[in-house]
Amino acid sequence: MEQYVIKGGNPLVGEVEIGGAKNAALAILAAAIMTDEMVYIENLPDVRDINVLLEAIREIGASVERVSPTEVRITGSTIANISVEYEYIKKIRASYYLLGALLGKYKTAEVPLPGGCNIGSRPIDQHLKGFRALGASVDILHGAVVAKAEKLTGKHIFLDMVSVGATINIMMAAAMAEGNTTIENAAREPHVVDVANFLNSMGANIKGAGTDVIRIKGVEKLHGTSYSIIPDQIEAGTFMCAAAATMGDIMVKNVIPKHLEATTAKLEEIGCEVEEFDDAVRVVASKRLKRTHVKTMPYPGYPTDMQPQFTVALTLAEGTSIVTESIFENRFKYADELSRMGANIKVEGNTAIIDGVHKLTGARVSAPDLRAGAALVIAGLAAEGITIVDDIVYIQRGYERFEEKLRCLGAEIEKVSSEKDIQKFQLRVG
């Protein structure tokens, strides 16, 4: 079992290059099998979730050629099986995108119920509602979603709640349906737009992505394409919060600043200086942070995936801050770990009340999920002394070369796999 061992207390300073958006890439990889022609995708993040999904796609018969860690060629003409093995799918929640892709192309799909981070109930009822509206019969049998249709027909679909996954899945299923489909109360996230742009580059007719009403005119078939995935706004936001928490100065490169507006606004609110460039943002924290209130909301509101990282910065801010989580339950499981590092944080339902302290101290902590794991790494970098983060497999699901990028900013962090390695690190850093 690998761990991160960190000696904290130093400001992070320098430049960091952001990779492709994991959440966009997962959906785009699934959508790539919807044509029999070759699809070339670049700016792919080299993270565990991507590798698992590529294995699942290869397992159902598609040709997958990993040109480089950030490039792949996929050809869906050789798919021989519309049933995806549980072995792959139990590891990642985004496996459900194969439902929309397979159903859209073959009018039948069988995909096990998804796994991924344990951050509360994330039902897929809105996905299934959309598939049924398009004319599919959908059952859950032996732990798998089985969807079948004689044909798919466009419909007016109103989502009962804003759901990124459901918006994307319905968009894929409707791309080759007969007639017109309208999705109301659609998610507006940048990766929804990226998936729509990708499908359109394959010949789909999708309009309105990025608004709450998406209109899809079904086409007969999709063709091959070359496509570059947008930068990962959550990875970018994570480094922005790391600058804030460590009193650092980081230039975050290869980003779309508009996608970071909510994070930027909150960092400025707590006293950081944020400078925007065409494809970069610079975050400078030169004085003690100020308190604030933040509530997670669907895009363009403050993202739930940035809540733990920002909370770490607030543990060191002056005064009392309040963080309200309105998207997922159980998203404060990292709070007890922060308390062990000296944070004064109290969780009441979906709200965390944080009384800022002057310093955190290193401790052994465990990552409960992907974003909370990254937040605990930030806490370790800001803390005095040695921090050990266990269960970093969660972090590896969504951050490529995380420790390498942090070291380039001056962090003292290593990935280790034994107590002996930890002792060596402690001796080396004193």
Residue ranges and their predicted role:
Residues M1-G430:
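Short, structured segments at the rim of ligand-binding sites
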